[in-house]
Amino acid sequence: IKFETEYKDDPETEAVIESILQEGEDGKKITTTKITLYDGEEFDKDIIKTETIDPKSKIISRGTKIVWKTMQTPEGEIRYWKKMRVYATHYDSRCPGCNDWTAIGMRAGKGVIAVDPKVIKLRSNVYIPGYGLAVAGDTGGAIKGNIIDLGFDDARTAGWSAKFIDIYLL
């Protein structure tokens, strides 16, 4: 029986910090069975008792306190609260399965990125070195976890190569 992971929000700890409060432990189901043999072969099988040892949840403390930081960029000084390492690819409205409108109704193109909403909330403002300011305004079938897709007006002439980069949530 697999253990579950629980998160406990901690308003006194910075939002980017997580720590394990309790390790998880899988549970067990133990069945005691009486097997009756006749001439050396199994003749009957009876369950005598079943015992369940419940799993112990893994508990992770997750900071929720926003601590603002500043950084100089070619666009000027920005204030951010979280730095994330992501794998950044690129797309435009002409890619297979794409169109002119994003998941939240914005026009696809430069300044709009596709994200996994479980990792980066839709409508979040983001700064991406080498790309600039953007809004998390789209999702995509291949965008899972720490992968983002940078929107361009024309991906063929964007000059962006897929790579790991640090981005900043504003």
Per-region residue spans from a language model:
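Solvent-exposed, well-ordered loop and adjacent helix/strand elements within mature globular domains
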Residues: 58-170
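Extracellular modular ligand-binding repeats in secreted and cell-surface proteins
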Residues: 1-80, 142
